[in-house]
Structure formats: structure tokens, C-alpha cells
Amino acid sequence: MRFALALALSLGLAVMSGAAQKITILTNGRNLQTPINHGLPDQPLGFTFCRLRYENSRRARKSGWGDDYPQADYNFMVRLAELTTTTISRWNNGDPGFANVTAMDPELFRCPFLRMQNAANYDFTPEETARMHDYLLKGGFLWIDDNWDPDFEYIRPNLMRILPGATIIDLPVEHPMFSILYRVNPLPQIPSLGSWQRTRQNSEIGPSTVHYYGVFDEHDRLVVLVSMNSDVSDSWEREGDNQDYFEAFAAKGYALGVNVAIWVLTH
């Protein structure tokens, strides 16, 4: 299976000027039992994809912190390096610098970009709540992904404990983050590959509408992004598993992810 992701981006989205780079699909050939990369990469001089690791407080709709790991993280880092001039960090074996940390790890504060998967599965402890509060107000950024309508009743209270008094805003497509490099319009609703193969619907749960919620600090800096009714990371993880799914969702998912990463790096 071969397809030019950059070409898909240039056809489906407004992209930066200059020739698009032709790249091929990353196959899902990595060993999903690869040892977990704890801590930060050996060669940290560049962008690092950090994922928040946790032990489930409850069993929500999906399994936990490791959904789509490590393939989504690996693929996203490769594509970020290919589609932009961003330097990425690496492990000594040459792998892109995707890693995971807990809320209490010392390395947390060296992760300007932090992803959390399936946040409805977890309630932060008081110590972790204080830690995440400090992390976000000292320059950190948290992207909570793969959430669907029933999950919000768990996610919102956690965010309100971390950032008391904060307002969760439904970000409009006109927010500059969504066009900082690629013009992402409309904002994508991305199902998991499995759900899409069963139903050919973009929503995994009924007629759910996609939302991208933002939380801002007192200086109007975006500190939390919540992709609601969308599983963006599956479009990264599964890009090599199904041609139709790739063509329907990969360009949208990567365009959004790259925009978010660049926004974090420049704001």
C-alpha cells in the first residue's frame, strides 16, 4: 500500500507554499509489545511527544492511557519531522522521541506538549491535581483525545479541579490554531478504524457532534485542548492498516495534529 500523504494534504487542505514532499504510508509493523519508553528521550534536543501515563480509576468506554500506543506516537513524530522543519528528539536507537510520563514524574515539566488518552478512565489524586495545575500554569499544554459524549461528565470535573474557575470554551473553526500551518476546515470528526469499518459513520456513538474545547489561563494562553467526539490519534496509528480509512481521515488528523504541535511550540 502506497499513498502520498503530503499530496493528500495539498489536495484536501490549504497548505504552506512550496512543493509538497511525497511520503509513503507507515505500515503497522512495529511490535506493539515494545517496552514502554519511560521518561524523556536520550537525545532530547527537539520536540518530544509526551503521553500521560496513569492507572485506571474506573473502566470507562475504552481501555486507558495506552490506546493507540506506541504506533500513533511514533507515526506522528515521523510525520511532524517530514511535513515541517521541526527538529524532533530521538532515543539512542534512532526512534523518534515519543515517551510517557506520570503526573508526578520530575520529567513532566520538560514536556511542553502532553497527550492524555481516554481521560474518563481516571480521576487525578489531590497531589496529581496540584501538580497538573502547576504544570499548565508554568507553560505546559495538555491535549485530551478520544472522548465521546458520555465521557464529559468525568472529564469536566477533573479539569475544574485542576484549574478552578476556568471556563471551557467550544473553539470555533476560526481560532488561529486551526490555520497556523494547514487550514483545517471543517474541524474533523474521526472515528476509530474498528468503528468505521463496522458502521461507515464518523461518530462512534449515535449522532454525536464534534467539538474541540479549549481551556485558557489568565493570560489567555490555551493550556488544554479536548477533542470531543473524535479519536484523532487513530488516524495516526492506523494510517497503514486500511487504504480507505487512510484516505478519509489521515490527512485531516495529521493536519490538525501538526497545527496543534506548532501552536504549542510558538505560544
Residue ranges and their predicted role:
Residues 4-14:
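Bacterial N-terminal signal peptides
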Residues 10-11, 40, 216:
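Sterically constrained small-residue positions within well-ordered secondary structures
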Residues 19-113, 119-120, 231-234, 238-267:
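Aromatic-Pro/Gly-enriched surface loop or interdomain linker
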Residues 22-33, 57-61, 151-239, 249, ...:
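An acidic, glycine-rich "communication" segment
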Residues 69-157, 161-162, 190-199, 227:
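Helical hinge/lid and interdomain linker segments adjacent to catalytic or ligand-binding clefts
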